[in-house]
Amino acid sequence: MSRTSPHQHQPTGELSRRGLLKTAGGLTAALALGSASVATTADAAPATFTHPGMLHNAGDINRAKVRVAAGTDPWLSGWNRLTANSHSQSTWTPRPTATIIRGGDGQNYPQLYNDIHAAYQNALRWHVAGTAANGDCAVRILNAWSSTLTEITGNADRYLAAGLYGWQFANAAELMRGYAGFDLNRFKTMMLNVFYPLNDRFLREHNDACITNYWANWDLCNMASIMAIGILCDDGAKYDQAVNYFKNGGGNGQIRRAVPFLYPGVEGYDLGQWQESGRDQGHTVMGMGQMGALCEMAWNQG
């Protein structure tokens, strides 16, 4: 079994963003591209953004509704696990704060991610079952944070907070777009003023470290946040920023650095080696998940 650098692959024709970003289902598909096709600057943003169009589109939601209503497994079993989770209850009380700290003294970031999970899970319950109490709860959480949060700080881990929680928060908001009482404009302002500047700064400066100092998951969560914010705000420039970094960025989250080697012809498959494979399985799988989220959002935009 030979090891092949993707940089040695022969160039092929230019792919559309869907052709490249369907790597959520198979990362090595993108690695089969040659350097000539990837080095061009993408003009990837759709003329009109699809909503909902992040991790779930309208077809996904309808399919879940139909399968759950029919009592079909594994959909019903998954639904029952969702509804039994404490974060999925309409009685959830948000705990917004003006400053989120991750890394260093005074860390309080679990307040944010627990509320994000609750908003997202209540939003799913509202979409699938139509229960107004869950929709109201999701909006209550989103509005509480958009009226309160002004800063994410801490040591270098603040960039992880802005990235990880940025794309997750935007996904919850995307599901509640158009819901009565949801202050979408204020939520957009929070995402643009609190999350995006950290996402953008990390990809440009990498916390003033060598550009390859940080593992792939650091780049990827910030790329996913920028893409999600672009979709939420109908901002093509931000969407393109994420796609272009995926293709051409200098950090370890760029596709050729995130999966630096291919092992071709293993029982009929090309296997890819993840950039963090020598670290631990938790971070390795998380990085793949971050890239999967990025690619799924791009796929749902067409």
Label the model's feature ranges.
Residues L15, H56-G59, A70, F182:
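Short coil/turn linker and secondary-structure boundary residues
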Residues T50-G53:
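Boundary/entry segment of secreted carbohydrate-active catalytic domains
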Residues M1-S16, L27-D43:
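N-terminal secretory signal peptides
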Residues Q107-Q301:
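Aromatic-lined, polymer-binding surfaces characteristic
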Residues A45-A47:
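Boundary of Sec targeting at the N-terminus
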Residues A58-D136:
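N-terminal carbohydrate-binding/catalytic regions of secreted carbohydrate-active enzymes
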Residues K22-G25:
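Internal alpha-helical transmembrane segments of multi-pass membrane proteins, especially GPCRs
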